[in-house]
Amino acid sequence: MTKYFGTDGVRGVANLELSPEMAFKLGRAGGYVLTKHADKNQRPKVLVARDTRISGQMLEQSLISGLLSVGIEVLSLGVITTPAVAYLIKVQEASAGIMISASHNPAIYNGIKFFGADGYKLPDATEEEIEAILDAPEDILPRPEGEGLGTVEEYPEGALKYTQFLEHTIPDDLEGLKVAVDGANGSTSGLISRVFADLETDFTTTATHPNGLNINDGVGSTHPENLVKKVLESGADMGLAFDGDGDRCIAVDELGNIIDGDKIMFILGHYLSEKGRLKQDTIVTTVMSNIGLYKAIEANGMKSAQTDVGDRHVVEEMREKGFNLGGEQSGHIIIFDYHNTGDGMLTGIQLMNVMKQTGKKLSELAAPVQTYPQKLVNLTVKDKDAWLTNDKIQAAIDTVEKEMNGDGRVLVRPSGTEPLLRVMCEAATEEKVNQYADQIAAVVQSEIGE
């Protein structure tokens, strides 16, 4: 298990847990590990980008200094999205890419995530190799001198190459569709107008004026309520909300209903399936996807494959089994036909393309997914794994599952960061879901609760 790396890179409160000193060390260690097998006849190249957080420039300078100190050529992208970095690695044939962002988290946080030469997030073994260098008693990495030091080059045309890529993933423009777009005051803020104007949409924007502190602040994919108002007030056909680094997308239909990642996956999957383009007729989901999605998938002749929470697990399953569509309820949608990581703007464009090609409203496309009421109970416990071998807890779960008789779901899972056990139930009615969740939670509390 990694010490510094979480499910999405290294993350913490900027200037405290994620300090400039740490960024420098990550630049040296990460840069060395990711370029040590590069062609010795040419200087290794690494792309660096950031989102709009106030701490971004501070960490960027330190990170780049670390990279330069091990002889790496840095292409600086400035403010751009995480999926843009992953895409441009391949365009530039770079050894790696690094994004400075804490995604959907508040401005006080920041993070550093690495991508390999293939544009994918790093495997655990590579992260562990970087951590071993960070924890070594002394720094034994190379310290080149003179012409051996790295250099920095600005790469402003990267944004244009990325937006052109997005625009060419659909066969036609999106003229005739009216859309409201929420940029979360993040990385997509400077790209939205260019893309949606080029695609000839009638668009309005909100949360596209970052000031370093307002990223994700009551806006974006984790706070779509403002976008709902914007859609209804403007009479838009739909709304799209991205997160701070642009790898998530949540939509809003013309009636003001929130269309989460589950519904987006269904809409895209159903469209691809009908066109014979959904590989193995399978959508890859995580354990947090609603039972309503699974019922809709099955009712429409498709299948699902399930992974643990985290888009990296979805990507691993897709790569291993040859699937081309997957994602999370939170709005990370991966469409392997075009990209190898979650991309909010790509997802939004594909969703609008389905609307244009079918002539259907977003509410109509999402209607087959009837989301079941869900209740989540977090319980502080003495031992997060004790529930697995506790007979009374297992019996309580079995009893509820038998009562559900296939018309509901129980998911019990430990928190990855806190001494909590999460009990999640889904059922056909609010009354039933409350009853079932409370029933199991009461037994957990009495058996292993603190």
Swiss-Prot record:
Post-translational modification: Activated by phosphorylation.
Cofactor(s) the protein requires to work: Mg(2+)
Binding site for Mg(2+): 103, 243, 245, 247
Active site: 103
Residue positions, PTM Phosphoserine: 103
An annotated GO cellular component: cytosol
Listed CDD domains: GlmM (cd05802)
NCBIfam families for this protein: glmM (TIGR01455), PRK10887.1 (NF008139)
Protein name: Phosphoglucosamine mutase
Organism encoding this protein: Latilactobacillus sakei subsp. sakei (strain 23K)
Gene for this chain: glmM
